[in-house]
């Protein structure tokens, strides 16, 4: 009759394998959380792959929208995140594309922005800075593509490894993008469309 005290080399090997697998699972879970593998962004104003909300449309150049920056919520950023940045880029605009928004120096404690955070002053209260977009205005400039084919707008939230980037309010969005790229731990994206 076997007892719990009987020695079975095969049993020991199996126990070791199970222990190793359990430890590997824990390490993998911790590493995923550390790297922000499940980092996501969403908006109450639209869904990924859908059309951008009517309140986000630009108010000039033939477009007649309220030009309000979208509400955004992000989750599961890398554990070592020290600040966040956000960009909105039209990848279908001619030549090099079109920057609609770039924001940096959002504190790591912030996990969402309300709608119209750009114009309302909410970002300034957080200590964040905004770039000059390709409409040549500081802050958010909504979609307003030429009539014809809809354009795709990529909204990206970046987790950064620095508290602040060496940038000033009103610098070009492309410069923001370059500085953001050099300090990124992870990013989350959604893409929306708009046409007229």
Feature roles, as predicted:
Residues 1-13:
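N-terminal secretory signal peptides that target proteins for export/translocation
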Residues 19-29:
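Bacterial N-terminal signal peptides
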Residues 33-196:
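N-terminus-centered regions that define maturation/targeting leaders and the start
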Residues 11-12, 31-33:
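N-terminal twin-arginine translocation
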Residues 5-7, 18, 34:
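Aromatic (phenylalanine/tyrosine) cluster motif
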Residues 16-18, 155:
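Solvent-exposed aromatic/hydrophobic patches embedded in short alpha-helical segments
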């Amino acid at each position: 009759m076997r007892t719990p005290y009987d020695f079975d080399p095969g049993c020991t090997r199996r126990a070791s394998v199970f222990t190793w697998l359990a430890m590997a699972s824990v390490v993998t879970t911790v590493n995923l959380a550390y790297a922000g593998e499940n980092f996501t962004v969403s908006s109450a104003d639209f869904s990924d792959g859908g059309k951008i909300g009517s309140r986000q449309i630009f108010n000039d150049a033939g477009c007649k929208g309220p030009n309000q920056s979208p509400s955004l919520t992000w989750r599961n950023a890398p554990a070592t995140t020290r600040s966040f940045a956000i960009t909105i880029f039209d990848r279908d605009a001619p030549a090099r594309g079109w920057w609609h928004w770039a924001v940096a120096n959002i504190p790591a404690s912030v996990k969402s922005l309300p709608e119209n955070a750009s114009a309302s002053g909410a970002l300034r209260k957080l200590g964040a800075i905004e770039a000059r977009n390709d409409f040549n205005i500081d802050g958010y400039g909504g979609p307003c593509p030429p009539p014809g084919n809809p354009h795709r707008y990529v909204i990206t939230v970046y987790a950064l490894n620095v508290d602040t980037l060496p940038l000033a309010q009103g610098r070009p969005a492309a410069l923001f993008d370059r500085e953001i790229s050099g300090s990124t731990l992870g990013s989350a994206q959604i893409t929306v469309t708009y046409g007229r």
